[in-house]
Amino acid sequence: MFKKEPHIKALSNLKNSERKKLLQTFQKQTNNEEYSFRTSTIKQTNFNGQKSVGTVYTDENNTPILFKEKHKEQLFPTVYSCWEYPALLPIVLTHGFVIEEHLFNGANLMISGSIPPFDPRCKIGTLCGIASKQAPETVLAIGIVELDLPSFDKVIGETGVAVKIIHHFNDGLSKVFKMKLEPPFVLSTQSKDNNISSKQIESSEQIKAVEKEQEDVKEASVDVEEIAEVLDHFTVSDVDYFITRALYYTLTQDKGLELPISASNFISNHIMRNLPPIDHNEVNVKKTSWKKSAKFLKHFEKEGFLKLKGKGDDLTIVGKNTDKDELKNFVPYKLGCSKSATESRESTTSKEKTSGMMYSLTLYKPFNLAKDLLKEVNLASHTYYTSQDIRSAVSQYISVKNLADTKDKGKVIMDDLLFDMVNKKKKVLNASRIIARGEILHPLLTNNFTEFYQIFKSDDTLLFKAPMKGSLPHIKIITEMKIGRKVITRVSNFEVFQVDPESLAADLRKICSGSTTISESQTFKCAEVQVQGPHGQSIIDHLNKLGIPSKWIDFENKLKKKKRK
């Protein structure tokens, strides 16, 4: 419902009688008479979204707690209400990556992505919350049940929408109210209403169902006493799953794999390097159910994936079978941080982290022809890459297609794909097919990739849940003279760095000893703080203390010096 930020009007307080009526209605709809508003003041405003209009109710701190669509009586709680009252709604568990990669990107929860057993209250049409198995009491999405979930004992092989998502954490509703509350990830061994049991901790079977790979595995059972430990660390089944996925990736996507290859080389240089972005101290062959590399490889030889030679632990992989259904249906994933991305961050961190400043990373996402090039070198076409990643991909493509000029290794003879990518915006029919290697990357990035940026705090945590489209924005500071010879300094475009306008205005009142006002910037269509007097440098110093480096701040002084007579 809130894929984009809705337009909202000014908030107004509800009358006491309306407040009581609203509470009674919601208690009746949720069959929860214990629920109550945490503040005595409740506000309301109308919203106008992309596909719906309605009313939002907030507490006295302007935190949205309920909303409903126009001409409909159904009230939906927000995730913030569920954080205050964990037992407010029945909860459907799913996997963390399903929430991050799918639900937060606008998808509904499929039955194959959910974790049974289900709450008996989760009948068709029931309002429910969605939580991850790592934090089973922290609701991250709200939705309506579309299937009779209690009737499902297993979800492997099942299809259909389990829950239609209405609202989720950090969606347009959260953004329009500028919410900064973070989920209270409390890991507990048992839910307050005993509706979330230890059996809901996922098995490797259910993860594979999300990936649509149907394999016969043993379900992992976990005692109640072990749940806290399981929630803090990967289970053996989880480790088995990740190592198995790395094997599938190696057999289907790893161009560097050359057979025959020794077992130790196969594990260290291929399996471990083809893991998703997880801690290798937590996920390795020693922590699997096989314990040893030899047992792991012999298991998959028995399953028909590999062909081995040797005895005992001295094994050599001499063949592979890519006709297995699991490999045919395998969907590649983003590998752990690439060397170039890590180096980019480390080089930036070394310069900026020491001073406690934020730092940024420029990323690129392919479209059209770029996807074709990445497929040729077996890279995913739906993820983000650094410029160094793309440079390496282009070099690999040139090598695979034998495009290097035999007379001059510093030049490339472009094939049709590379030629179209480089000359996409040039309407030159007879352009040369020969180009210097160093001249390929810039037009290729400009023509075929969308630029994104991600900002990291000084402690290396992400400022945004996902990279933001476009180039890194700059804060604008202007000192000028208004009519009446009144000098002011304006600051704008700071909200992207999670600087609150009201907090900034309050700080500048103290620092600059002058009055401040908050208005809307005509240039950036965002909040603008104005303070009396020429305080450009003082504002820059304050922003530096907030972790924003000076190179991200543009200061313009429009005050003209008086000419001497």
From Swiss-Prot:
The superkingdom of the source organism is Eukaryota
- InterPro entries per the UniProt record, alphabetical: EIF2D, eIF2D_SUI1, Pre-PUA, PUA-like_sf, PUA_eIF2d-like, SUI1, SUI1_dom_sf, SWIB_MDM2_dom_sf
Task: Give one Pfam family, short name only.
Answer: Pre-PUA
Task: Enumerate the spans annotated as SUI1 domain.
Answer: 475-547
The entry lists its GO molecular-function terms as:
RNA binding; translation initiation factor activity
Listed GO biological process terms: formation of translation preinitiation complex; rRNA processing
Give the PUA domain ranges. Answer: 89-170
Instruction: Give the SUPFAM superfamilies listed for this entry.
Output: eIF1-like, PUA domain-like, SWIB/MDM2 domain
* Domain SWIB/MDM2, chain residue ranges per copy: 362-447
As for family, the record states: Belongs to the eIF2D family.
According to its record, what is known about the domains? The PUA and the SUI1 domains may be involved in RNA binding.
Remaining remarks: Present with 3870 molecules/cell in log phase SD medium.
Q: How does it assemble?
A: Interacts with the 40S ribosomal subunit.
Can you name this protein?
Translation machinery-associated protein 64
Instruction: List the lineage, top down.
Output: Eukaryota, Fungi, Dikarya, Ascomycota, Saccharomycotina
